[in-house]
């Protein structure tokens, strides 16, 4: 998985050429047949997506996901509200376009030749490869050559089906697979780690995020090279929606919004550590419930889950932790820092978390106003680890190397250079363990992703349990003693009701 390199000159040229080609489709008033004009008249942009941390998910009634945030901003760009329909698999998404139930698909879908024969692709914004996955401890396949339909199961509409058909025709004549018409890719990955399936195929970003919550999932091999991800809409002679997408993406490229969102959702790195992730998740189950109230109490301006991730990186949630250099406690504070914060006992969990959060808040307050709000925390954490002055040096070095000193994606790449003499010798504040600060922030982000994913999945399971309980009302003891009917009470099947139940119920403000 990697972010696509952006060539701004090429974007400008392509924009001009497409703008000229799409000029007749731009939504001028007085053209009600125009697709964008219809969306504006209706007052809502209808998208279909799938449920995943990368595309769209909810926790505590708050929505998140790269495709969700982009689609929400695109709806704002059009001046309409966003209506979201969540489907179980990719085939259902394209059915929504065919049936006119969606204006576009925003679901991390890969661009390929088969899809663009029937649908209009939008701009691409990152890329993925398709990966064959299996469960840790089971036999790892080294090739696709001998896989059977009993071993390999794929979600309906998955882009890998086209690739497998090509491989079967050209290289692996014995290759076979089965399509599960009822389950999506996430459900199939779950079935793999549950031992119910041998293998499935998923994109590299989905696999990476799934591993943060289920480290038992392992990658056997890549079956494709990097493929661009894009939005899709219906293909016809009206290109107004494509023109609007192009202009929108050009705008967020130029103002840095796309880069910030990519860093937020794709910038957590690929160096997955099975043992470290499993250790963290076990602590989430066994230790976190005891200290979670403290994180919730003292988090203040940041999410408590992020504060918990910081504390895990510092001490593994051990209030008695002590380092060889003398820092102690849950947040590993120095004696001088603790005294400056008015703390009397660094090994008291409440005092340590409160003090560490106040110290971090001081760092956040120092971060220049030019830093975007959603990235200030990363600059502050780097400063928390290596000192604020060295953070200023990293920003200055980024500027000197023609990078963006206000972009965490650019600045973090310069952090390791602060420990290299050719660079630190020319900086105002000199040597710093910048490589440690880089690893410090990246580790915290990974732990946060694991924690958010774990809690989101737990919340979803609880909701499913409650929904199931509502379908099976309690029976009073005296009713158990009544004679049973000799015939079963059949009810009329309503297809529309079944489809309503299959859809995820979302917060009202999204409709």
Curated annotation (Swiss-Prot):
It is found in: Cell outer membrane. It is a peripheral membrane protein. It comes from the Bacteria. One of its GO terms (biological process) is cell wall organization. Keywords: Cell outer membrane, Cell wall biogenesis/degradation, Lyase, Membrane, Signal. Its EC number is 4.2.2.n1. Residues 1-19 form the signal peptide. One of its GO terms (cellular component) is cell outer membrane. Residues 270-511 are annotated as: LT domain. It catalyses: Exolytic cleavage of the (1->4)-beta-glycosidic linkage between N-acetylmuramic acid (MurNAc) and N-acetylglucosamine (GlcNAc) residues in peptidoglycan, from either the reducing or the non-reducing ends of the peptidoglycan chains, with concomitant formation of a 1,6-anhydrobond in the MurNAc residue. InterPro entries: Lysozyme-like_dom_sf, MltF, Solute-binding_3/MltF_N, Transglyc_AS, Transglycosylase_SLT_dom_1. One of its GO terms (molecular function) is peptidoglycan lytic transglycosylase activity. It holds the Pfam family SLT. SUPFAM superfamilies: Lysozyme-like, Periplasmic binding protein-like II. Its main location: membrane. The N-terminal domain does not have lytic activity and probably modulates enzymatic activity. The C-terminal domain is the catalytic active domain. NCBIfam families: PRK10859.1. In the N-terminal section; belongs to the bacterial solute-binding protein 3 family. In the C-terminal section; belongs to the transglycosylase Slt family. This is Membrane-bound lytic murein transglycosylase F. The gene is mltF.
């Amino acid at each position: 998985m990697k972010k696509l390199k952006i060539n701004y000159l090429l974007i400008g040229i392509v924009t001009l050429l497409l703008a000229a080609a799409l000029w007749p489709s731009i939504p001028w008033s007085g053209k009600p047949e125009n697709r964008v004009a219809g969306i504006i008249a209706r007052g809502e942009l209808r998208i279909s997506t799938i449920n995943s941390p990368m595309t769209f998910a909810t926790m505590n009634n708050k929505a998140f996901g790269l495709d969700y945030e982009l689609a929400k901003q695109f709806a704002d760009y059009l001046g309409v509200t966003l209506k979201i329909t969540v489907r179980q698999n990719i085939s259902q998404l394209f059915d929504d376009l065919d049936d006119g139930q969606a204006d576009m698909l925003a679901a991390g879908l890969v661009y390929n030749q088969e899809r663009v024969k029937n649908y209009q692709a939008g701009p691409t914004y990152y890329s993925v490869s398709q990966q064959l996955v299996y469960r840790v401890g089971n036999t790892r396949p080294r090739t696709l050559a001998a896989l059977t339909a009993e071993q390999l199961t794929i979600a309906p509409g998955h882009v890998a089906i086209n690739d497998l058909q090509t491989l079967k025709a050209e290289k692996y004549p014995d290759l076979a697979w089965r399509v599960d018409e009822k389950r999506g890719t996430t459900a199939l990955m779950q079935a793999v780690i549950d031992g119910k399936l041998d293998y499935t195929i998923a994109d590299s970003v989905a696999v990476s995020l799934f591993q943060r919550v289920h480290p038992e999932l392992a990658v056997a091999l890549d079956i494709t090279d990097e493929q661009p991800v894009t939005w899709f809409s219906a293909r016809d002679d009206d290109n107004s929606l494509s023109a609007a997408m192009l202009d929108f993406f050009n705008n967020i490229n130029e103002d840095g919004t796309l880069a910030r969102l990519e860093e937020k959702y794709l910038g957590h790195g690929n160096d997955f550590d099975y043992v470290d992730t499993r250790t963290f998740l076990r602590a989430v189950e066994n230790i976190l419930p005891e200290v979670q109230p403290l994180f919730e109490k003292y988090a203040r301006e940041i999410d408590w889950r992020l504060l918990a991730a910081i504390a895990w990186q510092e001490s593994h949630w051990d209030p008695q932790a002590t380092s060889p250099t003398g820092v102690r406690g849950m947040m590993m504070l120095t004696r001088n820092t603790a005294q400056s914060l008015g703390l009397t006992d660094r090994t008291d969990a409440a005092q340590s978390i409160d003090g560490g959060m106040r110290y971090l808040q001081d760092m956040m307050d120092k971060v220049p106003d030019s830093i975007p709000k959603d990235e200030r925390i990363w600059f502050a954490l780097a400063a928390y680890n290596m000192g604020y002055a060295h953070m200023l040096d990293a920003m200055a070095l980024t500027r000197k190397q023609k990078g963006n000193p206000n972009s965490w994606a650019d600045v973090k790449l310069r952090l390791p250079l602060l420990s290299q003499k050719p660079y630190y010798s020319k900086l105002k504040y000199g040597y710093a363990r910048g490589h440690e600060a880089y690893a410090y922030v990246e580790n915290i982000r990974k732990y946060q992703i694991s924690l958010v994913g774990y809690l989101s999945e737990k919340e979803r399971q609880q909701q499913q349990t409650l929904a199931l309980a509502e379908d099976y009302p309690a029976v009073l003891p005296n009713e158990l003693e009544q004679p049973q009917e000799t015939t079963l009470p059949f009810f009329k099947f309503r297809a529309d009701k079944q489809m309503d139940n299959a859809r995820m119920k979302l917060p009202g403000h999204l409709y």
